[in-house]
Amino acid sequence: MTDQYVLALDQGTTSSRAILFNRSGDIVSLAQKEFRQIYPQPGWVEHDPQEIWGGQVGVAAEAVAKAGIDGRSIAAIGITNQRETTIVWDRETGQPVYNAIVWQDRRTAEFCDELKARGLGELIRSKTGLLVDAYFSGSKIKWILDNVPGARDRAREGKLAFGTVDSWLIWNFTHGKVHVTDVSNASRTMLYNIHTLQWDAELLDIMGIPASMLPEVKSSSEVYGHTHAAHLGVEIPIAGVAGDQQAALFGQQCTTPGMVKNTYGTGCFMMLNTGDKPIESSNNLLTTIAWKVDGKVQYALEGSIFIGGAVVKWLRDGLGIIRHSADVGPLAQEVKNSDGVYLVPAFAGLGAPHWNASARGTIVGATLGTKAAHIARAALDSIAYQTRDVLKAMEADAGMSIAELRVDGGATVNELLMQFQSDILAVDVVRPKITETTALGAAYLAGLAVGYWKSVDDIQGQWQLDRRFQPAMAADEVLANVKGWQRAVNAAKVWADDQA
């Protein structure tokens, strides 16, 4: 094949990015553009779908130009995206009927509480693997139909289309010819049955959503359509799609059951490949579809931590004990350990596996001898402890012990955190050379579909180790530390209980 590159489009929550990869999985060029966050009122978060589209097509062209090539040198395009974010548009004009309602948006929380009060939580969970929450797309679509004048009637008449961000980009790249999504994105809507692999008529009825709005659900690695030549000069196959966390799991080459990755960003997202069968969680984790490749569906367990790297931002902007985020490592290293201080960063409640919305940020164990360095150390430690809580829940649900944790995301550059993570888990923590794993996953999915890479085995050998962190802490010390953390988490929960 004369084509030399695969273009990955990574449409995130705050920026649109395009990364060009070569056959070795190396980055050839990268372009990025941030876009506006729209906050109409407290708890509401929106994006402008046209700004997302314009920015994404712009960075795609920029990445290609930076590499000194043209569209003819691109074998395929892969798309990965912020999940759950909801767009509804007019099929005739292609114009959105409302802004994109972002995954973080909480406006439909009351409706979700009603669903739970009606006893529908278990039904929805059994079909979708998800907890009933405003986080997912279903209630957001309902809100648009209920609140945009005429939208419900137009939807009934088949005039409106719904899509997550991947669908919206593909629709625009193909000039309205293709309306599809992949199984990983569909599994985040609260409308898709992860067992039958179909949109669920009963759930659509509960939400009041006409089936005619929905995209066709495809695998994560196949040719969905071709870009219109107006965009990159030639028609290029769009051949890979996965939600961002699933794409990162694939990019980390966690393709066999029992492999797990954690992405350390503002929050943390951990995913465990559970193979060809969905595992229902008994520990408040989400059951979701990882991907469908070569006709085979693989499932995953997922746990979300609300405050990961954001705790460092709080040390900087809230407490003012560091001037730059990068200062946290050197400050924390001034002390041997946190000296019994624990920081539970429940600033927005606690995520998996606790799911306690009322818990609040808590510092325990402080004395007159506690210094800024101890607080910094406790803040970093909290990221590792929360990760341990999720991993232990995953091990319990899956009935397996994890051999190693593959890591990616901004906070993985912090050696102190990575070593403590390994210590507290008592497993190896493994950091790859290329940490752009989300975009790489999308590139792999697209490249596999067009034969750029021959097979999953073909790309397995590309994963390169940057550093392996191995446990060095004595077992009794680990036990004491974990016990202290659990007491601190209980303190954060008790504080919430006493407020009730």
From Swiss-Prot:
Keyword set includes Kinase: yes
EC number: 2.7.1.30
Superkingdom field: Bacteria
Keywords on record: ATP-binding, Glycerol metabolism, Kinase, Nucleotide-binding, Transferase
InterPro entries documented for this protein: ATPase_NBD, Carb_kinase_FGGY, Carb_kinase_FGGY_CS, FGGY_C, FGGY_N, Glycerol_kin
Chain residues that bind ADP: T13, R17, T266, G309, G410, N414
Activity modulation: Inhibited by fructose 1,6-bisphosphate (FBP).
Pathway field: Polyol metabolism; glycerol degradation via glycerol kinase pathway; sn-glycerol 3-phosphate from glycerol: step 1/1
Residue numbers binding ATP: T13, T14, S15, T266, G309, G410
Binding site residues for sn-glycerol 3-phosphate: T13, R83, E84, Y135, D244
Annotated GO MF terms: ATP binding; glycerol kinase activity
Catalytic function, reaction form: glycerol + ATP = sn-glycerol 3-phosphate + ADP + H(+)
Residues the entry annotates as binding glycerol: R83, E84, Y135, D244, Q245
Pfam families in UniProt: FGGY_C, FGGY_N
A single cellular component GO annotation: cytosol
Keyword Transferase (UniProt): yes
GO terms under biological process: glycerol catabolic process; glycerol metabolic process; glycerol-3-phosphate metabolic process
Principal EC category: transferase
Protein family according to the UniProt entry: Belongs to the FGGY kinase family.
Functional description taken from the UniProt entry: Key enzyme in the regulation of glycerol uptake and metabolism. Catalyzes the phosphorylation of glycerol to yield sn-glycerol 3-phosphate.
Protein name (record): Glycerol kinase
Native source species: Chromobacterium violaceum (strain ATCC 12472 / DSM 30191 / JCM 1249 / CCUG 213 / NBRC 12614 / NCIMB 9131 / NCTC 9757 / MK)
Gene behind the chain: glpK
